[in-house]
């Protein structure tokens, strides 16, 4: 369970609620070791593993791959209409393709400030674009900047090379 959880967290930083839930289960187990508590803990671990299975399948349910799902989660906000959610999914997929193409064109992109800035600007410009970017009536200027920064941090962390070593593990696990 712990290995699966760590893989999911490396792929998508917004899955920390699973980490917190797992830590709570383990802490409760360590607190008391009577038979009832142990049985309850194992039942809770089993339910938790089912939740991990569900989270693993969420990308498929959303019609995305794991890489696009991470960007979708970073872009999504509450109270979007179904049409806006579809648009955000399309933005996530297209943005990922754009960023990966840009990274591929720049050797050692993370080693120089100018190339890192270039990737950040690519992300910001894409999100601002009226045809391919975020719905302008749903995202303020500050929200676009915040999401662009969050996506850049995610890209910097998981794409030191292409293909990403974080998502390559998905095929192995």
Language model feature labels by segment:
Residues 1-173:
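Catalytic cores and motor modules of nucleic-acid processing enzymes
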């Amino acid at each position: 369970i712990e290995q699966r959880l760590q893989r999911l967290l490396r792929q998508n930083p917004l899955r920390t609620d699973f980490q917190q839930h797992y830590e709570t289960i383990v802490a409760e187990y360590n607190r008391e070791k009577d038979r009832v508590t142990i049985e309850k803990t194992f039942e809770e671990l089993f339910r938790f593993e089912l939740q991990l299975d569900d989270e693993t399948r969420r990308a498929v349910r959303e019609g995305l791959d794991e890489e696009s799902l991470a960007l979708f989660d970073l872009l999504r906000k509450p109270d979007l209409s179904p049409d806006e959610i579809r648009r955000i999914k399309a933005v996530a997929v297209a943005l990922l393709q754009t960023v990966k193409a840009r990274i591929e064109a720049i050797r050692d992109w993370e080693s120089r400030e100018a190339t890192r800035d270039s990737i950040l600007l690519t992300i910001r410009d894409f999100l601002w674009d009226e045809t391919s970017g975020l719905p302008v009536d749903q995202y303020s200027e500050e929200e676009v900047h915040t999401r662009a920064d969050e996506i850049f941090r995610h890209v910097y962390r998981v794409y030191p090379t292409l293909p990403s070593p974080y998502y390559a593990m998905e095929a192995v696990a």
